[in-house]
Design a protein with these regions (language model features):
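Beta-propeller folds
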Residues: 22-259
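Positively charged n-region of N-terminal signal peptides that target proteins for export
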Residues: 1-6
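Bacterial N-terminal signal peptides
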Residues: 7-16
């Protein structure tokens, strides 16, 4: 009886091995397709009604992502914003992320994102009004992919953002843009942070609206007392380039910050 049990166990292991061997592993599956990609929920946002959330899901027909809503109790799915409604010059706008206004009537669509330090924290922002269907780009005339951390005012009548280390406020009804800080530079940083604050403290977004929407509190960083590290970039061109950035070593001075 023992011999029979061992024989059956051997056959089971052998059949499992043969089954695994039959599953061909290709470079295309690993690097080109999402066959072994991590599964998750993209950019989940809790809705104002407290019974549903929104998320992003790929629309294969359009080649971009829909913004969809799920009822948490029933699981019912509905498309809030189809990708076909978010078009520019005949092409769908590729959503990297999105931000709701407090009343869920407006949305900021974040796209064309570029990497800053570890994460893609600068890009372009578009305004979507779900009541009127209006869809337009903010920051008209500004350099592409340079806006950071855009956010609605509490009344959703204005949007504030960082552009080249200065803070701006844009009126959504008139399009008028007001610059709030003027000393932003490679050494003076308003509304965001230098490398060490992101790397060691995990903070990137450096400003907030006041509850009444009349003021903005922001971090101001002065990196002039911090030593400069020079990184060699050998990947963006056939010729290397030097990238300087403030990099405090152990025992040296960090950037000076204030709110």
């Amino acid at each position: 009886m023992r011999i029979v049990s061992l024989f059956l166990s051997f056959l089971f292991v052998l059949s499992s091995f043969v089954s695994v061997q039959a599953q061909e592993l290709t470079l295309e599956d690993i690097y080109k397709t999402r066959k072994y990609g991590q599964r998750g929920v993209a950019s989940m946002r809790w809705m104002k009604d407290n019974i549903s959330y929104s998320t992003l899901e790929m629309n294969r027909e359009v080649g971009a992502r829909d913004i969809v809503r799920y009822d948490v109790k029933s699981g019912q799915r509905s498309v809030l914003v189809p990708a076909s409604n978010l078009m520019h010059e005949g092409e769908p706008v590729q959503i990297h992320d999105y931000i709701w206004s407090e009343d869920n009537t407006k949305m900021l669509v974040y796209t064309n994102s570029q990497r800053v330090w570890r994460d893609n924290t600068r890009g372009d922002y578009w305004l979507l009004d779900l009541q009127t269907g209006e869809f337009r780009q903010l920051g008209q005339g500004l350099d592409p992919s340079r806006m950071m951390f855009a956010k609605f005012s509490p009344a959703a009548d204005k949007v504030a953002y960082v552009y080249y280390n200065n803070i701006y406020v844009e009126d959504l009804s008139t399009g008028e843009r007001t610059q709030l800080t003027f000393d932003g530079s490679d050494e003076i940083i308003n509304g965001n942070f230098d490398w060490v604050y992101e790397e060691e403290l995990g903070i990137q977004d450096g400003f907030r609206w006041s509850p009444d929407g009349k003021s903005i509190a922001y971090w101001h960083s002065d990196t002039r007392g911090t030593g400069v590290f020079y990184m060699i970039n050998n990947v963006d061109s056939i010729y290397s380039s030097v990238i300087p950035f403030p990099y405090p070593k152990a025992g040296t001075q960090n950037s000076a910050v204030k709110v």
